[in-house]
C-alpha cells in the first residue's frame, strides 16, 4: 500500500505559537490524496475541480465551503482555473474563549457535515476578513497571533451566519441569481432541470445567466449538472448496494444505457468497473 502523504504544521506555520494562517491556491493544482496534522477551512472563489474528501467526490465551484479535520483525507483532480483559499489552524493552539466545537463542524473529530455553500453576500464578507487575517498572520509584530485568532473567530462566526446546505437556500435569502441557480441544480439530482422555467420564475435572461455561470465556474450549466450527478453516482456505487439501473434513476438519468455512456465519458470506466475497483477500498 502506498504511503499516505501527510502535510505537517512545521511547514505551514511560522512558529509553534501560531494558531492560524492562510494558504492561497491561485490556482489550485492537481494535488494527491493527503492528510494533515492541522485542520483547515476551504473556500472556493471561482473555477471548478473534483474534490474527493474521505472517498466522496464533490464537483466544486465558486461558493463551496469545506471544513476539513486533520484526519480527513482529500485530494484535488480535474481542476480548471480553480481558485481557493485554505484557512489552516491548529485547534490545540487556539486560546480565544469561543465555542469552537459548536461553531466548526468536526472541530474535535472527523465528523459532522463537512460540505456547505456560501452565497455572494457571505463570500464578499468572508473575503474581506480573510484578507485581514492573511495580513495579520504574516506579521512579526507584538500580538500578531492574538489579532489573527480574533479575526479567525470573526470569520468562523461569519461563515456560520451565511452558510447553507448545498441544495437548500434559506427562504429569506437575498443571494444572487447565480447562487440560487447552483442551489437549484444541486436539488435536481433526481429530477429534470429546466433552465427556461427557472429563468421565467426569476424574470431573467437565459443567455445572460448562461454567460455569467460559465464566467464564474468555467463550465456550462449542463456540464456542471452532469458532473454533480456523476459524482453522486460514484458515491452510491461505492457505498451502496443499489443496482446500477437504480443508481441511474437516483442520479437523474431516465435511461441506464445513457447513464453508462455519460459515466464512462466522465470517469474513463464503466459504472461496474468503477464499483469493482473502488469496492476494494472499503
From Swiss-Prot:
One Pfam family hit: HTH_18
Site residues, Interaction with sigma-70: 246
Top-level taxonomic group: Bacteria
Gene3D superfamilies attached to this UniProt entry: Homeodomain-like, Jelly Rolls
Record GO biological process: positive regulation of DNA-templated transcription; rhamnose metabolic process
Highest classification ranks of the organism: Bacteria, Pseudomonadati, Pseudomonadota, Gammaproteobacteria, Enterobacterales
Native organism: Shigella flexneri
Task performed by this protein: Activates expression of the rhaSR operon in response to L-rhamnose.
GO terms, molecular function: DNA-binding transcription factor activity; sequence-specific DNA binding
Record feature DNA-binding region, as residue ranges: 196-217, 244-267
InterPro entries reported in the protein's UniProt record: AraC-bd (IPR003313), Homeodomain-like_sf (IPR009057), HTH_AraC (IPR018060), HTH_AraC-typ_CS (IPR018062), RhaR_RhaS-like_N (IPR047220), RmlC-like_jellyroll (IPR014710), RmlC_Cupin_sf (IPR011051), Tscrpt_act_RhaR (IPR023699)
Identification of the protein by name: HTH-type transcriptional activator RhaR
Residues of the HTH araC/xylS-type domain: 179-277
PROSITE patterns listed in its UniProt record: HTH_ARAC_FAMILY_1, HTH_ARAC_FAMILY_2
Amino acid at each position: 500500500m502506498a504511503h499516505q502523504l501527510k502535510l505537517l504544521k512545521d511547514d505551514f506555520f511560522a512558529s509553534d505559537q501560531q494558531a492560524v494562517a492562510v494558504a492561497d491556491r491561485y490556482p489550485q493544482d492537481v494535488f494527491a490524496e493527503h492528510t494533515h496534522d492541522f485542520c483547515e477551512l476551504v473556500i472556493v472563489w471561482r473555477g471548478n475541480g473534483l474534490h474527493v474528501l474521505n472517498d466522496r467526490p464533490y464537483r466544486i465551484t465558486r461558493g463551496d465551503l469545506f471544513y476539513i479535520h486533520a484526519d480527513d483525507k482529500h485530494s484535488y483532480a480535474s481542476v480548471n482555473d480553480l481558485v481557493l483559499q485554505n484557512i489552516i489552524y491548529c485547534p490545540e493552539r487556539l486560546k480565544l474563549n469561543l465555542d469552537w466545537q459548536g461553531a466548526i463542524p468536526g472541530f474535535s473529530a472527523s465528523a459532522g457535515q463537512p460540505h456547505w455553500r456560501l452565497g455572494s453576500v457571505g463570500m464578499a464578507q468572508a473575503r474581506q476578513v480573510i484578507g485581514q487575517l492573511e495580513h495579520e498572520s504574516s506579521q512579526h509584530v507584538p500580538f500578531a497571533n492574538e489579532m489573527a485568532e480574533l479575526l479567525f473567530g470573526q470569520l468562523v462566526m461569519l461563515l456560520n451566519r451565511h452558510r447553507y446546505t448545498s441544495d437548500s437556500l434559506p427562504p429569506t435569502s437575498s443571494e444572487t441569481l447565480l447562487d440560487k441557480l447552483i442551489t437549484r441544480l444541486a436539488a435536481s439530482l433526481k429530477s429534470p432541470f429546466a433552465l427556461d422555467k427557472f429563468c421565467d420564475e426569476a424574470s431573467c435572461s437565459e443567455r445572460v445567466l448562461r454567460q455569467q455561470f460559465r464566467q464564474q465556474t468555467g463550465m456550462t450549466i449542463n456540464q456542471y449538472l452532469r458532473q454533480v450527478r456523476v459524482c453522486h453516482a460514484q458515491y452510491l456505487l461505492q457505498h451502496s448496494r443499489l443496482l446500477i439501473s437504480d443508481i441511474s434513476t437516483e442520479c437523474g438519468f431516465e435511461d441506464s444505457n445513457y447513464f453508462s455512456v455519460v459515466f464512462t465519458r466522465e470517469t474513463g470506466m464503466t459504472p461496474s468497473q468503477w464499483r469493482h475497483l473502488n469496492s476494494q477500498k472499503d
